[in-house]
Structures are given as C-alpha cells and as structure tokens.
Amino acid sequence: MEPLGNRRPCSVCITKNRNCPRFCEYAEYFPYELQSQYESANELFGTPNIITMMQHAPEEKKQMLATSIIMEGNAWTEDPISGGFGMIQKLMWKIMLHKAYLRELQEKIKEEKEKKPASSLY
C-alpha cells in the first residue's frame, strides 16, 4: 500500500468520517476513485458489515470480495427490485437472443451454399 501522502482517503474511511491511516487496510480495495460505487455498496451492506466481511476473508480472496461487494451494490442501484439476480436474468435473455440470431444466420448461410452449384464454390 502507498503512503497517504500520495493518495486520497479511501472510501471506507470517508464513509466512517475518520482519518485514513498511512497504510489503511481498505485503501487498496476501496480507493477514493470508487467512492460513488462504494456508497451503493454501503447502502446495501453497511460499512460495519463490509469491514467484517473483509476481516474474515483470506488475504488471497480480499480483492475478489471487494469487487463482488462493489458489483452487488451497483446491481441493486441499477435494479432495486431484483439486484444481481435481475442482471443475470437480463444477460441470460441476451444470450438466448444472440444464440437464436446465430442459428438464423447459420441457416441462411447453409441455404445460400445449397443454392450455388458445386463448381462455383471454388
């Protein structure tokens, strides 16, 4: 982690309205640049719960956890009814539509190949 002199306070310290220590353990995961996204996660989970989750996570999983917390907060901001599940449903629907479109294109290609005589293919 970098010294505070070279960075702004992290999102966790801003939310808790405290001075960000020189080597804050949350600065790496929730930097100042993610403040607006962190606010969404804070509304969903609350900073005390986020801190508890981060403290209990193994070191190698903390970055993944922080990313998941931010993404889940964003999902609920975007879709307050369904959250992350709603986003997954939308993505699955898009995949189904694209697969159907791909099948349609493959059938058209097959039809065009069948229309042309074999000698014109080369």
From Swiss-Prot:
Matches recorded under Pfam families: LOB
The text of the family note is: Belongs to the LOB domain-containing protein family.
Every copy of the LOB domain together lies at 8-109
The top of its lineage is: Eukaryota, Viridiplantae, Streptophyta, Embryophyta, Tracheophyta
Q: Out of the domains of life, which is the source?
A: Eukaryota
InterPro entries under this entry? Answer: LOB (IPR004883)
| Name of the protein | LOB domain-containing protein 5
